[in-house]
Amino acid sequence: NILAGIKVDTGAKELAGFKNEKITEGLDGLRERLLDYHKLGARFAKWRAVITIDETIPSDACILGNAHALARYASLCQESGLVPIVEPEVLMNGNHTIETCYEISKRVLNTVFEQLCMYRVVLEGIVLKPNMVISGLGCPEQANVDKVSEMTFKCLMENVPSEVPGIAFLSGGQSSDLATAHLLRMNEKYSDQMPWNLTFSYGRALQNDALKAWNGSDREAGQKALYHRACGNSFATHGKSLTHS
């Protein structure tokens, strides 16, 4: 079955007083909007927070402000009968190492779940959509697939409660191949240790191959490329490679 959902935040805006940091807005009138969306058939919603890594950021204020907004959104969703997708994204932009990404992702997830619990969000009724723990795009030393899977799994195990039923990764600017490979390796190595299901909620990493193959005119090639990439990611959620199935 296919269920309809809707993005309900109004975007990430400049956080006043905090240079180069953003806060996601959209809480005003959200209760009424969610009730309307549910009547129209929506069964889940999405709210994205973005966290930037640089020498002096993210600040505690940015992390807490975004976590607070995510928690209030999630609480209102559950009140309205919608499943909230909780998306705290630590951006890949920057020169930071994978170790720095791990430390920041840990802070973000810990704060998000503190706020979710404070606002009495039922963790069994959410989907977490986090970033993977990965090197910054400008980092001269790019972590390999094994390192990414190891540190991402470690970060999740330390900070995501077992009550959460599912984790659907965002791709966040990874290549299509790497996004699939990272998901595959985590499910290959750690599936017997995980209390939650690991799956994907990719945008660019799912669509890029299809857009290149389509090239504005070749509909059949685009469809085949999309199907192939979707199958590869689907297999990866079960710890299986499409090429060895």
Name what the model sees in each region.
Residues 1-41:
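Active-site cofactor/substrate anionic-group-binding motifs, chiefly glycine-
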Residues 1-5, 34-42, 75-79, 118-121, ...:
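Acidic (Asp/Glu)-rich catalytic clusters
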Residues 15-18, 49-62, 90-96, 137:
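Glycine-rich, proline-tolerant flexible connector loops at the mouths of alpha/beta enzymes
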Residues 19-33, 58-73, 106-107:
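Glycine-rich anion/phosphate-binding loops
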Residues 39-50, 66, 70:
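Hydrophobic alpha-helical segments and helix pairs
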Residues 61-85, 89, 93, 98-103:
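Active-site acidic/histidine proton-transfer and metal-coordination neighborhood
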Residues 96-245:
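Active-site capping/gating regions of soluble enzymes
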